Every structure is written in structure tokens, then in C-alpha cells.
């Protein structure tokens, strides 16, 4: 017999499949960029209260300092609010949030949630070279909730080699949905960033979601919108190479979503404190060099 709780769970999942994801995200994006003065400030205050957002660490601590929701979503933090671990053999976490999953890549399969796996081929848009690069490697998936800091930083010093935009769905990526929507992260819109580092090749993926109005990077600006219907690739070589330092900002979400990191086999050892649903902060240790 189906309980009322399981009924509502199934209803939530079913709604994700039938709702107009892109249309709702476009509407949310339009509202988020409006500058309505006191109305905007009132709504921001209500949002911050609902999600218990700590404004004491923001550079701008007053709600009236933000002209739009978008400004509030990507609010920068005070200097040293997130100290970067300076151990030269360690990589640091790229974002505030919670660990959705982490661990070993079994040949080409990553764990999405208990009982659900997805493949490197699907996640990396069938880029054969990248798929081979990360077989039997390590991965970490970090979920950014609406209450979290929405900027994404570098785990280590790196040189950007390639960026790939992959069109897709806009399912919610919260841990509940990750248990029920197959192939969730590999079917959603995403931006794949490929870096050369002293820890081997590293990928950092910014995954879109429902009402994530835009994803941006510090070197290319806003990647979406507009949304595209085909995979787009940018390469960075020679004078166009982009060098980033450990802890440096590399991108942002308007509103929060998910970051996935991939590491080559036998290059890193994930930090012992990483566990599912564990709250984490940008700058804390993610992994160590093997």
C-alpha cells in the first residue's frame, strides 16, 4: 500500500518530467534581473530568512545593497571568509554546498545516488579522449543549495585547455531528485571545463538546473542564455591560454546547482572527511596528490 509520503514523492518526480523546464527558467531569469527597489529588497530579505543565509560574511551585508536578485545570488564574500588551504600537495573544494556523491569511477561509471549510476560517455558528451582520460579515476559531486555561496573556484593552479557547452534538460538537481531521475547530471545542460594541472588532467563541470537562469565563467562571461541546441567547444592554446590560481574564482551560477570534479586514475586521494550529505566550504581540502 502506498503511503502518503511515497505518493507525494512520486508526484514531485512526475512534475519534474511534465513541467516546462526551460520556460520556467526563462521566467525566473527575467524576474531575477529586474530592479524593483524596495520590492526587490523585501523579496531578497524573505528569501534570506527562509534559507537562513548568513549575510555577515558577504561583502555587502545589507539587503538594500543589492539592486536585483541576480546581484544577490552571486554576492561575493568578505576577504578571508573562505580561507584557501595552502598545502601544496592538496586540492581544495571549489564551492560551498554538500557532497552529493564522491568516490572511485568504476571503469566508466560514476555513482549518482544509491542504486543509480551514469557513464563518462554521457556526462562528457561522448568525447572519446576525455572518457579514456578519466576511466578508473576519482570524482566528487558538490550540490549547491539556494542558501549557498554561488561562485565557483579553482581546486588548484591550472591552465584551461578546453571548454564544452552541452545542451540538455533542466531537472532540479537536489539530492532527493538524484535518487529518482536516471542519468540526471548527464542529461542536464552543463559546461565542461578541462584543465591541465600538476595533479594531472582535471575536469570541473558546472551543471545547470531548474531556475538556474545562467552559468558563467570568468574568461568567457555568461555562457547561457542564450541556450543552444548543439554542443559547442572552445579551445585555449598559446596566447589564448587561461591560467588560474588555486582558490581563484572561475565561474558562477544564478541560482545554485551542482559542480562535478573528475580526476585521472592514480593521481589523487580524496580527503577522508568527504562523505555523502556532508556540508563543505570552498577552500577546504578536497584531495591530496598521490
From Swiss-Prot:
Alphabetical UniProt keywords: Cell membrane, Decarboxylase, Lipid biosynthesis, Lipid metabolism, Lyase, Membrane, Phospholipid biosynthesis, Phospholipid metabolism, Pyruvate, Zymogen
Cofactor(s) for this UniProt protein: pyruvate
Top EC category: lyase
Record note on modification: Is synthesized initially as an inactive proenzyme. Formation of the active enzyme involves a self-maturation process in which the active site pyruvoyl group is generated from an internal serine residue via an autocatalytic post-translational modification. Two non-identical subunits are generated from the proenzyme in this reaction, and the pyruvate is formed at the N-terminus of the alpha chain, which is derived from the carboxyl end of the proenzyme.
Catalytic activity annotation: a 1,2-diacyl-sn-glycero-3-phospho-L-serine + H(+) = a 1,2-diacyl-sn-glycero-3-phosphoethanolamine + CO2
Record has Calcium as a keyword: no
Disulfide bond annotation, renumbered to this chain: none
Cofactor note (record): Binds 1 pyruvoyl group covalently per subunit.
GO cellular component, one term: plasma membrane
Chief place where the protein resides: membrane
Pyruvic acid (Ser): modified positions: 257
Membrane topology: Peripheral membrane protein
Subunit comment: Heterodimer of a large membrane-associated beta subunit and a small pyruvoyl-containing alpha subunit.
Protein name, entry field: Phosphatidylserine decarboxylase proenzyme
Species annotation: Haemophilus influenzae (strain 86-028NP)
Amino acid at each position: 500500500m502506498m503511503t502518503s509520503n511515497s505518493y507525494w514523492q512520486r508526484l514531485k518526480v512526475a512534475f519534474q518530467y511534465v513541467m516546462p523546464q526551460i520556460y520556467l527558467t526563462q521566467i525566473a531569469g527575467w524576474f531575477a534581473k529586474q530592479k524593483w527597489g524596495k520590492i526587490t529588497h523585501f523579496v531578497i530579505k524573505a528569501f534570506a530568512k527562509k534559507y537562513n543565509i548568513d549575510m555577515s560574511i558577504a561583502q555587502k551585508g545589507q539587503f538594500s545593497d543589492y539592486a536585483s536578485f541576480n546581484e544577490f545570488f552571486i554576492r561575493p564574500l568578505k576577504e578571508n571568509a573562505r580561507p584557501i588551504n595552502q598545502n601544496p600537495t592538496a586540492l581544495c573544494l571549489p564551492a560551498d554546498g554538500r557532497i552529493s556523491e564522491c568516490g572511485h569511477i568504476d571503469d566508466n561509471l560514476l555513482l549518482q545516488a544509491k542504486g543509480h549510476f551514469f557513464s563518462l560517455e554521457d556526462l562528457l558528451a561522448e568525447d572519446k579522449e576525455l572518457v579514456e582520460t578519466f576511466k578508473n579515476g576519482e570524482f566528487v559531486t558538490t550540490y549547491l543549495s539556494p542558501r549557498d555561496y554561488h561562485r565557483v573556484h579553482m581546486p588548484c593552479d591550472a591552465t584551461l585547455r578546453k571548454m564544452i557547452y552541452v545542451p540538455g534538460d533542466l531537472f532540479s538537481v537536489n539530492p532527493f531528485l538524484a535518487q529518482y531521475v536516471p542519468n540526471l547530471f548527464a542529461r542536464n545542460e552543463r559546461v565542461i571545463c578541462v584543465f591541465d594541472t600538476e595533479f594531472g588532467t582535471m575536469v570541473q563541470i558546472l551543471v545547470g538546473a531548474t531556475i538556474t537562469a545562467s552559468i558563467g565563467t570568468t574568461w568567457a562571461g555568461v555562457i547561457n542564455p542564450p541556450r543552444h541546441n548543439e554542443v559547442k567547444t572552445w579551445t585555449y592554446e598559446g596566447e589564448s591560454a587561461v591560467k588560474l590560481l588555486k582558490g581563484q574564482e572561475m565561474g558562477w551560477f544564478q541560482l545554485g546547482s551542482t559542480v562535478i570534479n573528475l580526476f585521472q586514475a592514480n593521481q589523487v586521494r580524496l580527503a577522508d572527511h568527504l562523505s555523502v550529505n556532508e556540508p563543505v566550504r570552498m577552500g577546504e581540502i578536497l584531495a591530496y596528490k598521490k
